[in-house]
Amino acid sequence: IFALLIALVMGLGAAIYFSIFIALMGVLLALTPIAAQLYGADRYAEIGEEVRQSAWLAVALGAACFALLRYPDPFMALTRLPPEVEERARGYLWAASWGVPAALLFRVFYGFSTAVSRPRVVMALNLIGLAIKIPLNMVFMYGQLGAPELGGVGCAVSSSVIAWVSCLLAWSWCFLAPGYRRYHVFARWSWPDARRLAHI
């Protein structure tokens, strides 16, 4: 019964989460062709500005997704689930919401790196995340190493942790790696530019 409850919570929570997340993530995919065009034209310094604006967009979309996942009443009203399952599904979405801003910022790095022909970095980070995901699931789902036993909610907790780890590693690499310096991502501060954001 416990295993069935975990499956129900994860299935419902993941369905709601990915429905919202993928819709918002699709907006950020526009960075890749924009940056790739600038890369092909050797206009490297301009790529940094596009990345900074995309990061602002990711923050805004992340805030919207964060709010939707923490107040999922419209979605729950459609499910008509037993109260116990609904409560746990809300817990799953609450835990997952913490990782959304980091996951979207990582997608900006993903699109940027892909555009400038550096996909290996992204692949390496994804593999690191996958390697961490399995033991973290065991820790949070089944209460290992002194952690509370969270069941399906623990899967969302581990996903949020990995999202932040991946995001921090990605942008630290972008800051430190010599191969990224010519794009001037960290050369200066940029406030949101409505014209550029509309273009993205």
Where are these regions (language model features)?
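Helix-terminus/linker motif at the lipid-water interface of multi-pass membrane proteins
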Residues: 1-9, 76-83, 139-150
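Small-residue hotspots at the loop-to-helix junctions and early N-terminal turns
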Residues: 2-15, 89-93, 156
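Short alpha-helical transmembrane segments in multi-pass integral membrane proteins
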Residues: 35-101, 147-200
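Alpha-helical transmembrane segments of multi-pass membrane transporters/permeases
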Residues: 58, 112-139, 153-160
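Transmembrane alpha-helical segments of multi-pass small-molecule transport proteins
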Residues: 95, 99-104, 126-134
